[in-house]
Amino acid sequence: MASNKTTLQKMGKKQNGKSKKVEEAEPEEFVVEKVLDRRVVNGKVEYFLKWKGFTDADNTWEPEENLDCPELIEAFLNSQKAGKEKDGTKRKSLSDSESDDSKSKKKRDAADKPRGFARGLDPERIIGATDSSGELMFLMKWKDSDEADLVLAKEANMKCPQIVIAFYEERLTWHSCPEDEAQ
């Protein structure tokens, strides 16, 4: 039975936990408690690991070739297969694993949150414009806020005409007519 120990070098490089004579100081060994997730980055498989004796905040992504815990990896992969067969759908990655309830709650909270001029903030400038919804809208940056909101152009024209004018002036380009150049 192979150990779940993984050796970390000073530069974060890992090697097999088997004992080797090293002229430098002995690298510290960490024990993998559980494999939590799997991903592929630049064609290399990485596993998200829970380290024994450490908190979840210390969990890390580690390349497969640096690990010496085949039983834990196999157990994780088997649980993934069982989950896929049971669900009949692809398992979500750790970053996407929020429950549907929390997602719908976030959507409700976002819908309840005031947007645009309803936030009571002063407009700073217009970042961009779109008519993808069928009506012209401006992406408005607000003073004293890092957030921007889409606001109806009609509303911006009424509430902050100088900011709308400044937005259009920034984008104006002048072209001279050929007959003007001849004079």
UniProtKB/Swiss-Prot annotation:
MF terms in GO: chromatin binding; enzyme binding; histone methyltransferase binding; identical protein binding; methylated histone binding; protein domain specific binding; transcription coregulator binding
Main localisation: nucleus
InterPro entries named in the record: CBX3_chromo_domain, Chromo-like_dom_sf, Chromo/chromo_shadow_dom, Chromo_dom_subgr, Chromo_domain, Chromo_shadow_dom, Chromodomain_CS, Heterochromatin_chromo-domain
Keywords noted in UniProt: Acetylation, Biological rhythms, Chromatin regulator, Isopeptide bond, Nucleus, Phosphoprotein, Repeat, Repressor, Transcription, Transcription regulation, Ubl conjugation
Localization in the cell: Nucleus
GO biological process: cellular response to dexamethasone stimulus; chromatin remodeling; DNA damage response; heterochromatin formation; negative regulation of DNA-templated transcription; rhythmic process
Domain named Chromo: residues: 30-88, 121-179
Sequence ranges of Basic and acidic residues compositional bias: 82-125
Gene Ontology CC annotation, any one: chromatin
Keyword Acetylation: yes
Pfam families named in the record: Chromo, Chromo_shadow
Function: Seems to be involved in transcriptional silencing in heterochromatin-like complexes. Recognizes and binds histone H3 tails methylated at 'Lys-9', leading to epigenetic repression. May contribute to the association of the heterochromatin with the inner nuclear membrane through its interaction with lamin B receptor (LBR). Involved in the formation of functional kinetochore through interaction with MIS12 complex proteins.
Protein name: Chromobox protein homolog 3
Species whose genome carries this gene: Homo sapiens (Human)
Lineage: Eukaryota, Metazoa, Chordata, Craniata, Vertebrata
